Amino acid sequence: MKTLILAGAGHGHIQILSKLQNMDLDDLKVIVITNFDRQFYSGMLPGYINGSFSLEDVSFKVEDYCNNPNIELIFDVIEEIDKNENVVKTKNGSYSFDYLCMNLGSKSIESFGPETESLHYVKPIYGFKELKDIGGGKDQLLIIGGGAAGVELALAYSHKYPGLNITIIDKHDDILLKFNDRTRKLSKKILDFRNIKVMYNTDIEKIEGNTAYYEGGELKFDQALVSTGVTGVDIKYTGFEVDEKNFLKVNNKLFAADNILAIGDMVHIREFPHMPKAGVFAIRMTPILVNNVFHVIFGGGELESYVPQERYLQIINTSDDKAILSWGPFAMYNKLALKIKNKIDMDYMKGNLVTDSFMKRFEKK
């Protein structure tokens, strides 16, 4: 019997498990290793915070996708993955594999030391199950980083706590640098209307206690959220190629070795070294991953290559029953934009990325 290990339980692995749990796995043992009992979808996090969605709406319970006697779910922390020995080492054990697929995500760059009761990093997303209720009354919420996550979180908390004092700090001279001019103008107008302060060209040098220090000043806060970029997770990859941020190098078919694949934020695709870390790319990777994993294990079909889309839809939930939709140079701010976002997100959570007709290519003859 061969062994497939799924390291991590991201959405790509949920898709694989949703198919495997209904298959005859007499010749295959599947081990799922994760330290999180739920897998969250970051795109719906603002809606979860502002009260539009429940915990069940925005997350998967991993054990619900392990309903097959040949699928074993292990809750543990992965510390090392050894390509040479074909083994995954965790805090409490060691597991050999014939095939390995990794979906381990990324983590926030911890620029200001470890988390505290008042300092929080946006990733991993799991922590927001607890952060949903931070800050109320007249508290001061500081958000460091003016990208999409920072802006959406500011607007979500503003909706949830109308009396909350919110400040976004960014080291650049503008926010939402990966968006078009129209989107930036709309966002700044909305932030201003909601009394959310934005400090530009301000680089936080250190945080001590509940004080953030920058050149020429300091800012007191009750809670701080940091969203200033991501790095690879804290795992030792023995025998693999990684980049300077510990992102795992794979080819455009998502292979790190002949029997090892990976997907999502954790990967650095050699053919596309400058591809952004964004959920829209991971979504498009998922059918490629499922196809190639099943091809390696079961045969059938052909290996497929992933090519990132050059232009993609971006939607910012403004937590006022509207959203800003951005496409190329175009942007619109209205209720329709939010309806489009919610439709995309809910379809994504229903897991319709891999169809039954797609799976027929792997049926036993």
Residue ranges of predicted features:
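C-terminal auxiliary extensions adjacent to catalytic cores
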Residues: 319-365
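A Rossmann-like FAD-binding core segment of flavoenzymes
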Residues: 73, 80-81, 162-252
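FAD-binding core/adjacent interface of flavoenzyme oxidoreductases
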Residues: 1-7, 68-140, 214, 221-227
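Conserved beta-strand segments of alpha/beta enzyme cores
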Residues: 29, 70-72, 118, 165, ...
